[in-house]
C-alpha cells in the first residue's frame, strides 16, 4: 500500500466515529427536547385545574336581644357553601335557618362576643347549627365558612 492509500483509509476511519458521535448527540438532544416539552405540558395541565367558584349565600342582618340586660347584637353573615344544592336547600328552608340562628344569637353573652375568640367560637356554633339536616331524611348542609358582613354590639 502506498502512503496515500493509508492516509485516505485513516481519514475515513477517523470520520466514522465522529459522524456516529454527532448522530448520537442529535438523537439524544431530540429525545430530551421531546421529553422536556411533555413535562412542561403536564405541569401546565396540573396548574390549569379548574378551581370551582365559591358558592356564597348572604343572609339578611339579624337584630337580637342578648341574655344580658339592655344588650343588642346586630349581625350580618354570609355563608360559604360547598355547592349549589346546599344553597338551594337553605333558600328553600330560609325561615327554619333564620329561626335556628336567632335562637343561637339570643343565647350569646355580650362580654364573650366582644373578644375575637368569642367571634370565632360563634362561627363554629353557626356551622354546627346549620349543618344538621333541616328536615328528616335530608343530607347535612356543608357550610365551609361563615363570614361576618356586620357585627355591632350595643
From Swiss-Prot:
UniProt GO cellular component terms: bacterial-type flagellum basal body; plasma membrane
Intracellular or extracellular location(s): Cell inner membrane
Principal cellular location given in the protein's record: membrane
Molecular-function GO terms, alphabetical: identical protein binding
GO BP annotations listed: bacterial-type flagellum-dependent swarming motility; chemotaxis
Membrane topology: Single-pass membrane protein
Record key words, sorted: Cell inner membrane, Cell membrane, Chemotaxis, Flagellar rotation, Membrane, Transmembrane, Transmembrane helix
Thylakoid as UniProt keyword: no
Segments crossing the lipid bilayer: 13-35
Keyword Transmembrane part of the UniProt annotation: yes
Domain of life: Bacteria
Family: Belongs to the FliL family.
Function according to Swiss-Prot or TrEMBL: Controls the rotational direction of flagella during chemotaxis.
Protein name stated in the entry: Flagellar protein FliL
Protein source organism: Escherichia coli (strain K12)
Amino acid at each position: 500500500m502506498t502512503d496515500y492509500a493509508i492516509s485516505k483509509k485513516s481519514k475515513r476511519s477517523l470520520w466514522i466515529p465522529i459522524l456516529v458521535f454527532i448522530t448520537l448527540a442529535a438523537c439524544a438532544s431530540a429525545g430530551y427536547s421531546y421529553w422536556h416539552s411533555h413535562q412542561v405540558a403536564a405541569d401546565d395541565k396540573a396548574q390549569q385545574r379548574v378551581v370551582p367558584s365559591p358558592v356564597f349565600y348572604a343572609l339578611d342582618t339579624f337584630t337580637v336581644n342578648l341574655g344580658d340586660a339592655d344588650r343588642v347584637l346586630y349581625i350580618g353573615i354570609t355563608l360559604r357553601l360547598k355547592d349549589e344544592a346546599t344553597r338551594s336547600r337553605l333558600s328553600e328552608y330560609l325561615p327554619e335557618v333564620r329561626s335556628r340562628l336567632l335562637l343561637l344569637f339570643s343565647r350569646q353573652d355580650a362580654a364573650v362576643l366582644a373578644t375575637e375568640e368569642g367571634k370565632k367560637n360563634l362561627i363554629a356554633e353557626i356551622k354546627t347549627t346549620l349543618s344538621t339536616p333541616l328536615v328528616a331524611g335530608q343530607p347535612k348542609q356543608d357550610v365551609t365558612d361563615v363570614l361576618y358582613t356586620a357585627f355591632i354590639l350595643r
